[in-house]
Amino acid sequence: MSLLINIDVPDAEIGERFYTAAFGLTVGRRFGKGFVELLGWESPVYLLAKNAGTVGAGGDLRRYERHWTPFHLDVVVGDVDAAVARAVAAGATLEAAAKDTPYGRIAMLADPFGHGFCLLQFSAKGYDALLGA
């Protein structure tokens, strides 16, 4: 199996500018207007232009204001503070400043379309730090 990351956005050009500036991703292929592949992570990212108010799934309408969802991306970085500065400069909203945890340093943000994500810098032990003695 493999993983693809599809992100609905109301404007693919704005999405492309954000994701390339915030994360250093590069454009792979363009599949017509409003559908672009971004490369640079272990899995490709596909930005799909979908208008707000259109049906997403199960009758739920797409909305691009900030919303909570139990599913989000954690982007693992080498320097969380530098990554936060880069993402915010590109248009992200910082929702929770970077904090230290047993497994590393983590900050919570949202992209310009309301999709939440975390920036995570693992400690030497990473999630193994959460295992019992």
Model-assigned labels for residue ranges:
Residues G116-L119:
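Short glycine-/small-residue motifs
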Residues G15-T20, A87, G114:
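Conserved active-site tyrosine of GNAT-family acetyltransferases
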Residues I14, V80-V84:
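Short, conserved charged micro-motifs
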Residues M1-L4, L25-D74, V84-A110, Q121-A133:
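Vicinal oxygen chelate
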Residues V77:
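Residues forming the ATP-binding cleft of Hanks-type serine/threonine protein kinase domains
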Residues V9-D11:
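Conserved beta-strand-loop-alpha-helix junction that forms the acyl-donor binding cleft
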